[in-house]
Amino acid sequence: MQNLFPKIRRILLKAFVPEIYWPIKVDLDGVQVPVRGMPLNFGTKYWLKKGEYEQDERHLITKVLRPGLKVLEMGGSIGVLAQIIGEKVGPKGRVLSFEASERLVEISTEMWPLMPQLQRVKGFVFPVNNGENIFVGEFQTEGSELDGRGIWELRDGMPGNTWDLRSIRKEFNFDPEILIVDIEGGESIFDAIPPDFPDNLQSVIMEFHPHIYGIDGQARLEEKIIECGFSLVDRSGQCVLFVRT
């Protein structure tokens, strides 16, 4: 029942807002983002049209991004930020973008042309070095295929079904210098497993979700990152930039 109202709202918006209302493309940080005709919900198209889609992450990434860097994104959604980062790091850089939703991976594949330095991966992923026992048994959506989060648990002595920094390094030969995280509350894993970030990681941009674990919970999770040798240097909305000291 709780998902019924959003579904009805989306049907009404689609009926009363014609597709021609949306621009064919919008320019975000030099990247042409297709909008009209794309299988995106009203809210996503609205924020794209206003130029404010993922603006907090886009603002913070400009402070640390340079050509040639290796960037790991956890929670790629429709791939806008990954595409922007791929353009900025250039052919000598590398971007690995993980997304848990199969539908979102399909949409991002449809929206974007191939880019040699950018690889998109479907899978559950957590921002810890060793999360081999993290198991996600359910992917919960919030009434829209464009929103959702994995419900995780620890299974001691049993292998999980998720990616972590260590398995990514091993499987993809990828040791990122920048980590960007927006996994809808999955950052609360820090309460169970310390991040233990590898030395090569220099910057972390994380979107927090205090509506899930509270303001005090966010402060506690931020401290877990600081304890790994990082300083909190900037905030934008619910996104926080940490840089290694």
Language model features with spans:
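Short, hinge-like loop/turn segments at secondary-structure boundaries
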Residues: P113-M115, F135-T141, F197-D199, E222-K224
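General small-molecule cofactor/ligand-binding pocket signal
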Residues: Q119-V121, V233
